[in-house]
């Protein structure tokens, strides 16, 4: 093994450690019987999980997060599919500008998007409501859905759709019988990935949620001015949920590629 390979592996290990070590520490301290995050641990306990599960505010925030994440996933995936299919099927003047605008939100700092959303929703009179969080998260996540589905469409054999047309199928019927089944793995991946992004998103939700707090916003309220071990427990649950959704999305893509290779 060359020195370059060793250096690259060491660098990769540092990156992985930098990302996941704080998460592991949070998981570890979520079972610590001491109130303060110190080593050595005072002992093993599930008290902090029992505390949050008995907290009605936690369950309300969890319900809000689940409603927002599931609604966002459906809307973002639907918009992403429509945009991806438009890019795949049609050519029109201004198409490059159209795609640039669609893919713009991930490149804008979240604080700017949050302030713009807050001002816009306040003007519409819907600031602080669940639909406003869903709308904001849809804007944030739709570009990811579009990218996933468009990548899948780039792999389709165009003769399949042409064969459907030759057999008398309308464009809508060809889409339902050819395009949608072909894109099903990407659509499934998009649903889980956008749900994970929405479930874990804090900055925009903090500005537009008002009294309808999501779990990340609820965590911020807990940590303000105090050290509360509940934060480690809630953070562990949020991370586990988000990672589960992401892993499911990756698995859908992986197994589809495996079946194609076979």
Q: What are the roles of these predicted feature ranges?
A:
Residues 37, 41, 46, 95, ...:
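Membrane-interfacial helix termini and adjacent extracytoplasmic/periplasmic loops
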Residues 21-34, 64, 114-124, 192-198, ...:
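A structural signal for multi-pass alpha-helical bundles of membrane permease subunits
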Residues 1-5, 70-102, 115, 119, ...:
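Transmembrane-helix boundary motif in ABC transporter permease subunits
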Residues 1-56, 60-63, 67, 248-262:
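N-terminal, non-cleaved signal-anchor transmembrane helix
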Residues 2-11, 21, 150-161, 165, ...:
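C-terminal transmembrane helix and the adjacent membrane-cytosol boundary/short C-terminal tail
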Residues 2, 34-36, 49-57, 199-250:
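Interhelical loop and adjacent transmembrane-helix boundary motif
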Residues 59, 63, 67-79, 83, ...:
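Hydrophobic alpha-helical transmembrane segments of multipass integral membrane proteins
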Residues 11, 16-23, 114, 132, ...:
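Transmembrane alpha-helices
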């Amino acid at each position: 093994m060359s020195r370059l390979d060793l250096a690259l592996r060491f660098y990769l290990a540092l990156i992985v450690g930098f990302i996941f070590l704080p998460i592991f520490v949070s998981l570890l301290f979520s079972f610590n019987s001491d109130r303060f995050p110190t080593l050595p641990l005072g002992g093993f306990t599930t008290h902090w999980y029992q505390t949050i599960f008995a907290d009605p505010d936690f369950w309300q925030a969890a319900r809000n997060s689940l409603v927002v994440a599931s609604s966002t996933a459906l809307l973002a995936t639907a918009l992403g599919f429509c945009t991806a299919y438009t890019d795949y099927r049609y050519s029109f003047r201004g198409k490059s500008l159209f795609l640039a605008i669609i893919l713009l939100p991930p490149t804008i700092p979240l604080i700017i998007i949050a302030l713009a959303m807050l001002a816009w929703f306040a003007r519409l009179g819907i600031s602080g409501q669940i639909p406003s969080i869903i709308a904001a998260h849809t804007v944030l996540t739709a570009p990811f859905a579009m990218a996933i589905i468009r990548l899948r469409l780039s792999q389709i054999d165009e003769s399949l759709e042409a064969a459907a047309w030759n057999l008398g199928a309308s464009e809508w019927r060809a889409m339902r019988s050819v395009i949608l089944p072909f894109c099903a793995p990407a659509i499934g991946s998009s649903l889980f990935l956008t749900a994970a992004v929405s479930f874990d998103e804090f900055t925009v939700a903090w500005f537009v949620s008002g009294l309808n707090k999501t779990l990340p916003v609820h965590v911020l309220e807990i940590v303000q001015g105090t050290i509360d071990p509940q934060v480690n427990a809630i953070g562990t649950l949020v991370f586990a949920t988000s990672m589960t959704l992401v892993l499911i999305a990756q698995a859908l893509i992986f197994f589809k590629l495996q079946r194609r290779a076979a």
